[in-house]
């Protein structure tokens, strides 16, 4: 993959991942800033992990993409898509194998999967365990938000706290990926108390990533994210696995609706992955 492929990668990913009428509506709601942030993310991944980013071309057109990254001892698949014309051809399997080559030497690996049957089958065949998830979505009941949440806005020096929490929860720090989220779209929230500590990268009330060493701290961070949802707009909490039961009462209490979503796929030696709401592209 080359930096100039970002436009084509965005087009291929958007058409491959957003096929239903409901998905198309999500695409139409994207602002120009949203689109540019996604392209910037592809370039960010390429800059930090050039050996993990691959595109497949057919007649000069990008037909498939695989983007992976390595942070400390953990490998993450950030994106794997194949356009409709090239499905069931083995292209997705080949791209995944290319991306997995960069996992050599890593102790753990993670993927946030779609619900597409072929994707889940492919990851299971590669030795990943699949953990079903829920998504919570809706307008926040602001009267349900607890008062006196012990959560503050984060500062640059809190990146080390976030790294410590990441290593305890997921086995590796996000490093430049968290910095990228904060530079492009998100705000850092931090909680520290005797029982534990944690952080969240929040975007318009939705947690882009949240990790903590204590479930009570995690609940407060999630409430603090939801509190920042602009009035009348909808919040979204993604990748709620069975290990994140601490988050379900918060979502229900806030008036969000729960629906099934794609699995988190894991392999090898990772942290407890709880309390933890991962980032889709960065986990």
Question: What is each model feature region?
Answer:
Residues 73, 110-112, 129-142, 258-269:
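Conserved catalytic-core motifs of GNAT/GCN5-like acyltransferases
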Residues 116-134:
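Internal alpha/beta loop-helix hairpins
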Residues 21, 44-47, 51-53, 57-58, ...:
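Intrinsically disordered, low-complexity, positively biased terminal segments
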Residues 1-105:
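Active-site-proximal cofactor/substrate-binding loop regions of enzyme domains
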Residues 144-148, 272-273:
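Short, charged/polar, Gly/Pro-enriched secondary-structure boundary elements
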Residues 1-11, 149-161:
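A short beta-loop-alpha structural element at the N-terminal edge
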């Amino acid at each position: 993959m080359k930096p100039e492929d970002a436009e084509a990668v965005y087009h291929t990913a958007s058409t491959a991942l957003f096929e239903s009428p409901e998905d198309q509506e999500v695409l139409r709601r994207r602002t120009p800033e949203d689109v540019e942030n996604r392209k910037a993310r592809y370039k960010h991944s390429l800059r930090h992990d050039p050996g993990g980013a691959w595109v497949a071309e057919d007649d000069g057109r990008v037909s498939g993409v695989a983007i992976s990254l390595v942070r400390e001892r953990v490998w993450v698949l950030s994106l794997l898509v194949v356009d409709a014309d090239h499905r069931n051809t083995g292209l997705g399997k080949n791209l995944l194998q290319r991306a997995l080559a960069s996992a050599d030497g890593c102790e753990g690996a993670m993927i946030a999967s779609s619900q597409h049957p072929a994707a889940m089958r492919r990851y299971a065949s590669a030795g990943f365990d699949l953990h079903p998830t829920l998504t919570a979505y809706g307008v926040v009941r602001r009267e349900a938000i607890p008062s006196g949440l012990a959560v503050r806005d984060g500062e640059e020096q809190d990146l080390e706290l976030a790294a410590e929490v990441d290593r305890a929860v997921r086995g590796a720090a996000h490093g430049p990926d968290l910095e990228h989220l904060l530079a492009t779209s998100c705000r850092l929230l931090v909680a520290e108390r005797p029982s534990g500590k944690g952080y969240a990268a929040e975007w318009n009330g939705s947690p882009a990533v949240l990790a903590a060493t204590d479930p009570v701290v995690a609940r407060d961070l999630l409430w603090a994210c939801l509190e920042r949802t602009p009035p009348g707009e909808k919040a979204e909490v993604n990748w709620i696995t069975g290990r994140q039961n601490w988050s379900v009462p918060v979502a229900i209490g806030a008036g969000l609706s729960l629906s099934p979503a794609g699995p988190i796929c894991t392999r090898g030696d990772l942290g407890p992955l709880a309390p933890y709401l991962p980032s889709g592209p960065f986990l």
